[in-house]
Amino acid sequence: MTVLLDTNVLVALLVADHVHHEAAETWFAHIDRRFATCPITEGGLVRILIRQGQPAESVSSVMSAVSSHPGHEFWPDDLPYRVIPMTGVIGHRQVTDAYLAQLARTRGGRLATFDQGLAKLHDDVADLVPTKG
């Protein structure tokens, strides 16, 4: 089974000074499955890296490294929003969460997140990545 990394987990894995970097690395080292990214999560990573001041060329290298990892799968964002269950969505920030959860369901995978609310709302498909503290 493949696990889709939400943007925060993806960023935490790749940004050494992220508050959850160590927790993400520990979790990732112990999962025994492939991992996936999609345009939404990759776009989030690109935005954050550029906002932190990384040059676009450097960001492109990071994205190439992620996609060339032997355990990586790329999942296209190919679901129309009309098929996304909106049960429990009460705010605009939960729309992307609902999309990622449905993408994982559709692909027969899981969704890894640090977001307790997302994990609770989509407990059928979301795994809460443990943090220290």
What are the residue ranges of the model-derived segments?
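Active-site neighborhoods of divalent-metal-dependent phosphate/nucleic-acid chemistry enzymes
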Residues: 69-116
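Short, conserved alpha-helical segments within structured domains
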Residues: 41-42
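Short glycine-/acidic-enriched loop or helix-start segments at secondary-structure transitions
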Residues: 15, 84-86, 121-124
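Conserved beta-strand segments of alpha/beta enzyme cores
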Residues: 34, 71-73, 125-127
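Short, well-structured N-terminal submotif of metal-dependent ribonuclease cores
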Residues: 1-37, 49-61, 132-133
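Charged phosphate-binding loop/patch that engages nucleotide di/tri-phosphates or the phosphate backbone
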Residues: 106, 110-133
